Amino acid sequence: DAGVSWKVYRNKTLGPISSVLTYGSLVTSFKQSADPRSDLVRFGVAPSYPASFAADVLANRLPRVSWVIPNVLESEHPAVPAAAGAFAIVNILRILLANPAVWEKTALIVSYDENGGFFDHVVPATAPAGTPGEYVTVPDIDQVPGSGGIRGPIGLGFRVPCFVISPYSRGPQMVHDTFDHTSQLRLLETRFGVPVPNLTAWRRSVTGDMTSTFNFAVPPNSSWPNLDYPGLHALSTVPQCVPNAALGTINRGIPYRVPDPQIMPTQETTPTRGIPSGPC
């Protein structure tokens, strides 16, 4: 116990498509989950979303670190339309904005565990061969259930989206520093002074701690942002998703109709923070 309060909020009301599907099996792997008095159950199982989360925000008792686990319909995993995830993000922000005293000291980090395809023109950083702690070297790993038989470097991988939304990161702006999922742990390490012991020196040298996503040199902009829900045009994708949901599986989808004619996409631009940006 490092003295940093935390909770995991998850949806429990949608049966098989609630957060239990994506999170429940992970928690029950720990023996503490069988004890209703344990901190794991009190803070990692009992809290619900949106009820407990909204109540804690309104009462100004949100813990210092919170995780919100979406239900399957909000996860943007095929065959669910990506617009459903956008609705979920807006709903979380609306809950936070309901209490300005909470919002002015809160940062919402929206993270993804996978990219949207199998191609990235940017080659990820890879640790030199033999770097301790950065290579899987277990013999006969293909005999380990669920391992996929992969031996070699542990990341980095294809790029995935990440949004940092707070009064200190108003933009929109883009940060070009290199982060990975452990960067969120590094941010907590920097903010609360609790060391993360399981990160190698190589990973620390390659990835940042996400402090560069904030600008503390200017007063916070805690005004109400534009939170319009995704346009109704996004619902046009739903008919395309129904066959996948009904006939496909979570790993094997039905091909979508290829638009015709096709045009080359236009690369979007946005203001960027300096490189390296670091804490302001």
UniProtKB/Swiss-Prot annotation:
Molecular function, one GO term: phosphatidylcholine phospholipase C activity
Keyword set, alphabetical order: Cell wall, Hydrolase, Secreted, Virulence
Catalytic activity: a 1,2-diacyl-sn-glycero-3-phosphocholine + H2O = phosphocholine + a 1,2-diacyl-sn-glycerol + H(+); 1,2-dihexadecanoyl-sn-glycero-3-phosphocholine + H2O = 1,2-dihexadecanoyl-sn-glycerol + phosphocholine + H(+)
Enzyme class: hydrolase
Gene Ontology CC, one term: extracellular region
Top-rank taxon: Bacteria
E.C. number: 3.1.4.3
Region annotated Disordered, chain positions: 258-280
Family: Belongs to the bacterial phospholipase C family.
Function: Involved in virulence. Induces cytotoxic effects on mouse macrophage cell lines, via direct or indirect enzymatic hydrolysis of cell membrane phospholipids. Hydrolyzes phosphatidylcholine. Does not have hemolytic activity.
Designated name of the protein: Phospholipase C D
Organism this protein belongs to: Mycobacterium tuberculosis (strain ATCC 25618 / H37Rv)
